[in-house]
Amino acid sequence: IPWIFFSSSITVGSASIVAQKDLIKKIYFPRMVIPISYVTSSFVNMLLCFIVIFAVIIVSGAGINFLALLTLPVIMLVEYILALGMAMLTSAITVYFRDLEHILGIVTMAWMYMTPIMYDKSIVPENLMPIFNLNPMTHVIECYRAVLYEKKIPDLTTLLSAAGLGILI
């Protein structure tokens, strides 16, 4: 679910300014509002999906670590900042290079396989770990995994790079 939010924020957010070109021509308002609205819409969708996930966790009897659950809003906020930064960057570039909208679908798919979503980070060879850790979504997904699957409190300091990148962009 977190990856779907991130991926859809980038792909849909990249085309947001181009899609609303008629509105932009008619009314003056800060252009940043458009990608923000698209990313926020995807974020609300993710929050609603998390309600279903928590219901499944409770019904299945898997259990929840409530102390670890308190870190979930921080993880979500960092992911939101990163997705918003990427969406703003790609939406600005897409205005000049319209094909970027289509290329981003392929890029996010490749990015998904470079992020430990369907596999554990421990299977990555040690010599590739420095390169692997450059991916900001690796840290975000690892924190989600720690809270939801391992029921542990994640190391939130690993999220600083993702938050910093999102703010920088």
Regions from the language model: what does each represent?
Residues 2-13, 80-92, 113-118, 122:
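Transmembrane alpha-helical segments that form the membrane-embedded catalytic/substrate-channel core
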Residues 2-7, 36-37, 67-75, 125-130:
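Short alpha-helical transmembrane interface motifs in multi-pass membrane proteins
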Residues 5-43:
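Transmembrane helix boundary and interhelical loop/hinge segments in multi-pass membrane proteins
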Residues 12-27, 48-57, 102-119:
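Hydrophobic alpha-helical transmembrane segments
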Residues 26, 31, 69-70, 112-113, ...:
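Hydrophobic alpha-helical transmembrane segments of integral membrane proteins
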Residues 31, 36-107, 151-169:
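Alpha-helical transmembrane segments and their short interhelical loops
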Residues 101-104, 111, 138-141, 145:
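Membrane-interacting alpha-helical segments
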Residues 116-168:
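Membrane-interfacial helix-loop-helix junctions in multi-pass membrane proteins
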